[in-house]
Amino acid sequence: MIFVWLNILFIIFSFQVFAGDVIVIVDRFKHKNEAPVKFSICDSEECHIKRDKGYVDIDGELIEVNDNFRKYRIKNVEPGECSLSAYHDLNNSGKLERSGILGIPQEPIGFSRLDVQKIRRHPKWDEVKFHVDENDTSVMVHLVNRFGL
């Protein structure tokens, strides 16, 4: 009987998926204030294409601050491909401020792995995706203040 229970426990635990933490290093802060950085995560290309409607807000724990960057830990991210977007919430409103019909961001934003000085378009999935496994995964987000053509 004990062997049956051991086999059942083995089967249950062998299918368990272990989530990993993502360490996010955010840099290029033009505004030297202590306003929070807000994160959103996306786990597929289909989700990424939907832009703001596809991404899900996620909390990041601030673990290090210096003059050049801030480091955050996002806990328990499911293994697989994903992308992050971030914005510096300058007015602490809890939402990305946009202007006009085109919805141009009024606060600095960035995406995982995207290293540009100016955002001209929504980045492609292959430009921003990264792999998460059960170990800690590190990714850079460079904030950008300039948008458009």
What are the roles of these predicted feature ranges?
Residues H31-E45, I49-K50:
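Short, ordered, surface-exposed loop/turn motifs in non-cytosolic proteins
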Residues P108-G148:
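Extracellular beta-sheet/turn segments enriched in Thr/Pro/Gly and aliphatic residues
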Residues L90-R98:
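Acidic, glycine-anchored loop motifs typical of Ca2+
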Residues V22-F29:
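A short, amphipathic beta-strand motif
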Residues L6-N7, V17-F18:
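Cleavable N-terminal signal peptides
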Residues R28, R73-V77:
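Short, flexible loop/turn segments at beta-strand junctions in immunoglobulin-like
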Residues G80-A86:
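A short tyrosine-centered beta-strand micro-motif
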